[in-house]
Regions:
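Histidine/acidic residue-rich metal-binding segments in metalloenzymes
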Residues: 1-62, 69-90, 101-115, 119-122, ...
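Structured loop/turn residues at secondary-structure junctions
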Residues: 45, 65-66, 158, 296
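Short glycine-rich, flexible loops that bind phosphorylated cofactors or substrates
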Residues: 68-69, 162
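Active-site glycine-centered loops adjacent to acidic/histidine catalytic or metal-binding residues
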Residues: 93
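Short, glycine/acidic-enriched loop or turn micro-motifs at the edges of active sites
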Residues: 96
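Active-site microenvironment of metallo-dependent hydrolases
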Residues: 101-117, 121-315
């Protein structure tokens, strides 16, 4: 695609680091992908995928988050194959706030990897030094040495890896789970409270029109929580509107441009969502954070959408 290649070239000319997304790609396609200047990937779900990418010079972010957890699959084979870890890192690819409270963030990746047998220093390096080397930030970060920024975690031991002290810029900010440095209250900019630039909706806004008694529609089939595919479904039509089906687990799904208020939107169908609901709406979603509405009937979908308009976002 010429437009994509032009964008990649502009980023490389500006010295940018381009992160990749190579789910399901291998062989010649992966070689072509790497040749474009993309240096990393967080999508490998098994060791073979990790190894293929490492051999092509890529950096790998091993994912452990609310969407997928890949440490258990990958770390033991990294160890048994004595694979170098200097181009391995951790990432979450999205974490639920409740998971952060219960498990932690990248510190959780360190602890889990150590439990799986990874050397503690290698695990810490994958969470710090390797990342800064990848992003060309090693001059200032990634080690404790003269001339580097003093952003430091102090652990009690090398097994639990629970931070006892936290220094930011050389200043102690947390000690024994207590914030010891004053935190300035920053006023929320007004523009941040007015980001859902949408109109009020009625059920008519969620109609999918058809003149037949039945309609064959394209639908997004959720094979897993991550993998989807396009399928065809036959749905009933009432009063010129294609309706969802609880029996087939097919709901309506709509997406609206909440950021620019352009009135751009699309309405389709979603299979295997797995919830018998009136409607669900959210402005928190990967990656656009537009307003998504899922529902079994248009009236409830309009109510859910208007609720987010009133609250200026949320779920």
């Amino acid at each position: 695609d010429p437009k994509t290649m032009k964008t990649l070239s502009a980023m490389l000319d500006s010295g940018c680091i381009i992160n990749g997304h190579t789910a399901g790609v291998s062989g010649k396609k992966l070689n072509a992908y790497v040749s474009s200047g993309i240096l990393s990937c967080h999508e490998p779900t098994n060791f073979d995928q990790v190894l293929e990418r490492l051999r092509l010079g890529m950096w790998i972010m091993i994912r452990e988050g609310s969407i997928r957890r890949d440490l258990n699959e990958i770390i033991p084979l990294v160890l048994s194959n004595t694979t170098y870890t200097n181009r391995l890192m951790f990432c979450s690819d999205g974490l639920d706030p409740f998971d952060i409270i219960e498990f932690g963030h990248i510190d959780h990746c360190i602890r889990e990897s150590v439990k799986l047998g990874l050397n503690q220093i290698d695990a810490i390096s994958m969470a710090s030094k390797n990342c800064f080397d990848y992003y060309n930030m090693g001059k200032d970060l990634g080690g404790i040495a003269p001339g580097k920024l003093a952003d430091i975690l102090v652990f009690d031991d090398m097994t639990k890896m629970k931070p006892r002290k936290v220094f930011v810029g050389g200043k102690l900010v947390v000690s024994n789970n207590t914030i010891v440095s004053a935190i300035k209250n920053q006023p929320v900019p007004k523009w941040m409270t007015k980001t859902v630039k949408l109109k009020k909706y009625t059920e008519n806004d969620f109609f999918v029109k058809s003149n037949s008694d039945f309609a064959d529609v394209n639908a997004i089939n959720m094979k897993t929580e991550i993998i989807t595919e396009r399928i065809s479904e036959s749905l009933s039509v009432k009063k010129g509107n294609v309706i969802p089906s609880f029996d087939k687990d097919v709901l309506k799904v709509a997406a609206f441009d909440r950021t620019f208020g352009s009135a751009k939107h699309t309405i389709g169908f979603l299979k295997n969502f797995g919830a018998k609901i009136g409607a669900f709406a959210s402005t928190w979603n990967f990656h656009e954070n537009n307003m998504i509405v899922i529902g079994s009937n248009e009236k409830d979908m309009a109510i859910a959408a208007n609720s987010l308009l009133r609250t200026q976002g949320g779920m």
